[in-house]
Amino acid sequence: MGITVLKNEGLDFHARISTPLSEIDDDIQKELLDLTKKVKIPGFRAGKVPVSIVKKKYGTSVRNDIIERRINHSVNHIIKEHNLNIIGRPKIEELQNESDKALEFTVKIELLPKITIPDLKKISLDRPKLEVNSKDVEEQLEKLAALTKNYTKESKAKIKDGDQVTIDAIGYIKEKTFEDGKLNDFKVIIGSNALIPGFEKQLIGSKTGSKVDVNVTFPENYHAKDLAGKDARFVVQIKAVHTAEPTVIDDEFAKKFQSNSLEELRTHFTKQIENESEEAINTIMKMNLFDKLEKLLDFDVPESLLEQEKNILKSGTDKNEQDESLLKDKSSKEITAYYNKLALRRVRIGLLLAEYAKSKNLQLEPDDLRKVIMQQARNFPGQENMIFDFYKNNPRAIEGLKGPALEDKAVQYIFNHEIKLKEKKYTKEELEKYLEAEEQRITLI
């Protein structure tokens, strides 16, 4: 076997490989002789079939198998001989495979870069810390109390905010009724914004037995596209008005929600408020870490990974209206530059984290995958069981989660053992503003 290295620079390794015709013919002859002992052909005893007959029947397929094995052997030999850290499948080009000539081909191999892990201990980040105060907890208690109000007291007074109103309604667009434009015995809490914006306010001041004309405009993003943005008039019959009995927030109230006391319920809400922001905090901290890493990394990346990531980004943008709107006023040159920069960032950071996980011998545990599946499920409220069933019944889909799961594990390890974290305290309102601003920023990266 002759090997001529054509290119060995950067992340590209190209070589021309030649195997003498005599070696190919010897391999074919040995394979045919073996087949004479195994094949069964009518008219011949087992093990006594002439080579010429076997060659006539199986010669082409045997030669193809030998060529494939020779190519694979040669490529594996080159990879081992030159200690190549490859990515993807080697490409075979310019194949010369005539039966009367030596086997020759060019192999093109893409390499993974040599990655030097930067000194992560020099990185410092702020870690947002939510300080839950009594006002935050009381607001949650009030919301819970509002959800559990008993509207048992019928009222003959004028409708006001907080009343429960039972209505019949018929909707008209340009004086014509429309599909799903009727309500019968519909109960609505005034001020709950359960109906089209502006609908409930126009019922205030009316009484049981009144007929009210309500004029509204369907929102542009209304789920029924044929109604979105259109003006409508509803003729509303007020059938009944009920006021809520006052809810006393005390230990007895808490016991309705599996808490032994009001103090225990308050503790539950404190933890719930903290947990609600934890995932968003972790996502933003991860992006802030990636911002720091991006400035430290300058190694070349495989072109195939770069193209693959750009295609993923473009596909994601096509499906995401928010991302699409970010690019709608950009020139094709600016859009290409955006995708190139973002793809390069993601591939570099992904390769670094994979190398870091390897250096720390980080291994995935079943719980790591469960966490990633839970994160996926949270993206589809009300369809969680469907997501769980999907991954339960699709092992290959779980394979696709292993990369992100290991990346998350590496990031958490870096947070816990490498970088300096400085706790920065926020009130609930301050944290919500901070998270909103950060979420808008990271849509660009």
Curated annotation (Swiss-Prot):
Annotated Gene Ontology cellular component terms: cytoplasm
Annotated keywords: Cell cycle, Cell division, Chaperone, Cytoplasm, Isomerase, Rotamase
GO terms, molecular function: peptidyl-prolyl cis-trans isomerase activity; protein folding chaperone; ribosome binding
Domain of life of the organism encoding this protein: Bacteria
BP GO terms, sorted: 'de novo' cotranslational protein folding; cell division; chaperone-mediated protein folding; protein transport; protein unfolding
Function: Involved in protein export. Acts as a chaperone by maintaining the newly synthesized protein in an open conformation. Functions as a peptidyl-prolyl cis-trans isomerase.
Domain notes: Consists of 3 domains; the N-terminus binds the ribosome, the middle domain has PPIase activity, while the C-terminus has intrinsic chaperone activity on its own.
NCBIfam families: tig
Protein name: Trigger factor
Organism in which the protein naturally occurs: Rickettsia rickettsii (strain Sheila Smith)
